[in-house]
Amino acid sequence: MNNRWILHAAFLLCFSTTALSINYKQLQLQERTNIRKCQELLEQLNGKINLTYRADFKIPMEMTEKMQKSYTAFAIQEMLQNVFLVFRNNFSSTGWNETIVVRLLDELHQQTVFLKTVLEEKQEERLTWEMSSTALHLKSYYWRVQRYLKLMKYNSYAWMVVRAEIFRNFLIIRRLTRNFQN
């Protein structure tokens, strides 16, 4: 019976040190630096704007509210993964420099892998996050972005609308990183 309590205490000790092991200050710095790089790359993707192609994809309002630190990290990871998937689509009609798009994809991939590694130890919280309404709204939002591109046959005007939307995403991610402060 005593061994059982010792085992419970050991598990609690193990989980509490795991929970404290994420350095949120470092995570904040890393994310801000990487998002700035992505914004700079996105700004280099030029094209013509046609206001008739405007769309409101309705980003979930929860994304602008304060969340607990680990949920913020999961939200950022979800956003980066989906932005990566958006830019993997057929962008050939845009006339964009393929090298810049590849660099953007590489930067997004590196950030996603970094966050996945950092958050690996938070599997229980990940399950809770994935079932949350915020996560579901976020998935639905990116589905609307993908659907818009597909309906518009990936034309250059639609891509410029999506480019502007993704730029807003990066601004939201930068704002979310403030949650990593004490």
Curated annotation (Swiss-Prot):
Signal peptide: 1-21
PROSITE patterns associated with the record: INTERFERON_A_B_D
GO CC annotation: extracellular region; extracellular space
UniProt keyword terms in alphabetical order: Antiviral defense, Cytokine, Disulfide bond, Glycoprotein, Phosphoprotein, Secreted, Signal
Gene Ontology molecular-function annotations: cytokine activity; type I interferon receptor binding
Presence of keyword tRNA processing: no
Record-linked Pfam families: Interferon (PF00143)
GO terms under biological process: adaptive immune response; B cell proliferation; cellular response to dexamethasone stimulus; cellular response to dsRNA; cellular response to virus; defense response to bacterium; defense response to virus; humoral immune response
Keyword Glycoprotein: yes
Modified residues (Phosphotyrosine): Y24
Main location: secreted
SUPFAM superfamilies to which the protein is assigned, alphabetical: 4-helical cytokines (SSF47266)
Function, in words: Type I interferon cytokine that plays a key role in the innate immune response to infection, developing tumors and other inflammatory stimuli. Signals via binding to high-affinity (IFNAR2) and low-affinity (IFNAR1) heterodimeric receptor, activating the canonical Jak-STAT signaling pathway resulting in transcriptional activation or repression of interferon-regulated genes that encode the effectors of the interferon response, such as antiviral proteins, regulators of cell proliferation and differentiation, and immunoregulatory proteins.
Subunit structure: Monomer.
Similarity comment text for this entry: Belongs to the alpha/beta interferon family.
Protein's name in the database: Interferon beta
